[in-house]
Amino acid sequence: MHNFTNWTNALNPTRFATRLNSFASGAHIAWPGQSGKPSVMQMAERAASVEGLTDLDLNYPDHVSEDPAELSRKLGDLGLSINGFAMRYYTNPAFKLGAFTHPAEDVRRDAIDLTKKGIDAAREAGSNLMTIWLGQDGFDYAFQADYAKMWQHEIDGIREVCEHDTDCLISIEYKPNEPRSYSLMPDAATTLLAIKEVGARNLGVTLDFAHVLYADEQPAFAAALIARHSRVLGVHLNDGYAKRDDGLMVGAVHTLQTVELLRQIRRDGYEGAIYFDTFPDLTGLDPVHECEVNIRTVQRMLKVVDRLEQDNRLASAIDRQDSVSTQAIVQELMFGADY
């Protein structure tokens, strides 16, 4: 289980987790002649072939159709641990109008109870991290919602699931929109406001790099704010063009911002896994090779972070807010001094 109480330890670069559904990509090649979607264990077996991968995140209830402890054992036999569970609110069609914020009390109760079952399942599987992405909680039209009432429902729901098991960490993953036009948890500041109102010690934030980008935030700044007012419980690395949730490979577009984020979370004492929330399945990429490249990319970036932290010139230039010098130093340490 993860221990987030000791904030003096540096980021452990050896724990890498990934999105299980990525390994359904190119199913016709991996499982020729098979009709239908691959099973959870088929995808897990494929993921286990990724060099350097240590963990998986499981969606609840989608990936958990058997005893959680038995599922954990099977994954352990493959050499994989469970980093955490992530809630999905698709089982009830009414959730399209909201999970914790649905206008009907019975639907809200269904969503909250489903989350509690997910927390119990995560604990049975040996994990103490539950990520909640409340993507259905939001609105699409002017005059659609009573904003104060909707916000109160959200706060009440989050508080109740936090109180269900105070030893389980609950991490809010924010996202500006999609599937709703406006999400109730769209950015770092709003999420931190909610966390302050909830007041639960086991509550924190998951930073998804692509979500942060199209929330028009600087990832390292968002991480610093969260560390100041709460804590980062999860880091989802990917990349994109800051217009939507592209799910591109790590460093494909925003290399410097990714390095800066890794430096920031290391300085703030993040101890969790680095999770790859990328979408190789959208275009049929080889998910094993894609994940291996992501791991190698982050390992190289962490070496750059090591060099940056050992270079007194950078700290001095940052203290002066001398952006020309900081860019020169970072580029030199990334690509070499020769030209």
List each model region and its residues.
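Glycine-rich, proline-tolerant flexible connector loops at the mouths of alpha/beta enzymes
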Residues: 55-76, 138-142
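A short acidic, helix-capping loop that chelates divalent metal ions and anchors anionic groups
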Residues: 26-29, 93-97, 138-143, 178-180, ...
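Glycine-rich, positively charged N-terminal anion/phosphate-binding segment
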Residues: 29-46, 65-85
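Short glycine-enriched loops at secondary-structure junctions
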Residues: 84-91, 126
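Active-site beta-loop-alpha junctions enriched in small/polar residues
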Residues: 21-23, 59-63, 87-90, 135-137, ...
